[in-house]
């Protein structure tokens, strides 16, 4: 077969250009560190890299939302901690107020202190995140969630929580009702209180304590009335179920001794008179922090109270303060649990992002060791081809004959 010189030249030039293009491509890959610079380089790999980039973008957006939630929950947890500290100060003040030697003037001074602490607590309830968003507004953020009216503080936020996030809903606020308005009244199971004297209509001359639950299974959820009958020292008590009218317990009365019935235990202290009544009602989840403080102030500013009235009011106020503090601490614990969940979610998101970045790198990044090796091999081949071509070009039939 006869091959013309022109044909040989064309084939050689084509081979050289192909090797040069391969060399340029390898050089571009080494410079960028990318195996794929355009989709045509590897359509399958390019598609995988694009999916990974989209995943990373979604994770980054969700992470920004999560960080906003972490900031809001941190501030909320701090606010609930501050609120609990203030309630503890109020409790200590009420313990002072229970001193039987205090005068009306001294108790009024304690009431003023409680009012000042109440104002601080109200400010915390309307605290923002620094960007104008109210921490305890629930789903509403257009204005302060709590307003002070003539009838006391009122929650005007929206039930629930604001949420953000792409993959999950991350809370940006706390439902202020849960923290400030939904404590369980009494001891959490039932509520004791002084009634009136069935004969005179006056307040009892004794007081009832908070009581305790001794058998949860025996609770009926009914209301009860405890009545003292007779005159000291031959007095007795009778406990009547308000629902049925049946007597469920009765015995001789002794100051400070336990009165037990239907899974509950409590004691009445002091010197009651014939006809004094006390009430027991089921606990309800509607105890408002600010209502508790307002009642405590009202009690402390009421003059000329009897010793029994002071003791009963003080026992009630301390019981209610303890109840709202327990509730505040429970909500704070829930926020702390949310913060832990957010931290765990952030850890998982970091792992997902790392996985997406790895997949993206595997799809489009260049193996530098292999890339350098390929480049050197292509460079050597290209140089050899150039040298061979140059040598062939210098050869001719005349040179062959004369050599």
Model-derived features with residue positions:
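Amphipathic alpha-helical polymerization modules
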Residues: 1-149, 294-403
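Cysteine-poor, low-complexity segments in flexible/peripheral regions
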Residues: 144-306
């Amino acid at each position: 077969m006869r091959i013309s010189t022109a044909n040989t030249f064309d084939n050689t030039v084509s081979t050289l250009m192909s090797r040069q293009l391969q060399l340029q491509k390898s050089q571009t890959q080494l410079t960028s560190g990318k195996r794929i610079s355009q989709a045509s380089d590897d359509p399958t790999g390019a598609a995988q890299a694009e999916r990974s980039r989209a995943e990373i973008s979604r994770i980054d957006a969700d992470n920004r939302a999560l960080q906003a939630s972490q900031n809001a929950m941190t501030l909320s947890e701090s606010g609930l901690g501050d609120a609990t500290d203030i309630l503890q100060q109020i409790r200590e003040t009420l313990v002072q107020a229970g001193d039987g030697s205090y005068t009306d003037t001294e108790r009024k001074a304690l009431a003023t202190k409680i009012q000042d602490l109440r104002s601080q607590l109200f400010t915390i309830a309307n605290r923002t995140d620094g960007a104008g968003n109210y921490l305890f507004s629930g789903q509403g953020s257009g204005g302060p969630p709590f307003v002070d009216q003539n009838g006391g503080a009122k929650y005007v936020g929206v039930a629930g929580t604001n949420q953000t996030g792409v993959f999950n809903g991350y809370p940006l606020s706390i439902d202020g009702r849960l923290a400030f308005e939904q404590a369980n009244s009494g001891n959490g199971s039932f509520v004791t209180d002084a009634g009136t004297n069935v004969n005179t209509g006056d307040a009892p001359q004794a007081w009832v304590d908070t009581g305790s639950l001794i058998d949860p299974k025996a609770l009926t959820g009914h209301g009860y009335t405890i009545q003292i009958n007779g005159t000291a020292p031959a007095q007795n008590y009778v406990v009547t179920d308000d629902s049925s009218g049946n007597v469920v317990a009765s015995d001789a009365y002794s100051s400070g001794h336990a009165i037990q019935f239907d899974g509950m235990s409590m004691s009445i202290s002091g010197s009651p008179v014939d006809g004094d009544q006390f009430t027991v009602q089921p606990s309800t989840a509607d105890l408002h922090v600010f209502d508790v403080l307002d009642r405590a102030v009202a009690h402390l500013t009421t003059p000329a109270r009897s010793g029994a009235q002071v003791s009963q009011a003080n026992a009630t106020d301390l019981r209610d303060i303890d109840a709202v503090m327990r509730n505040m601490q429970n909500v704070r614990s829930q926020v702390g649990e949310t913060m832990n969940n957010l931290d765990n979610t952030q850890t998982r998101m970091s792992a997902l992002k790392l996985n997406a970045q790895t997949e993206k790198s595997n799809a489009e990044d260049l193996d530098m060791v292999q890339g350098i090796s390929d480049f050197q091999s292509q460079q050597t081949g290209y140089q050899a081809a150039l040298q061979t071509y140059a040598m062939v070009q210098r050869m001719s039939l005349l040179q062959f004959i004369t050599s």
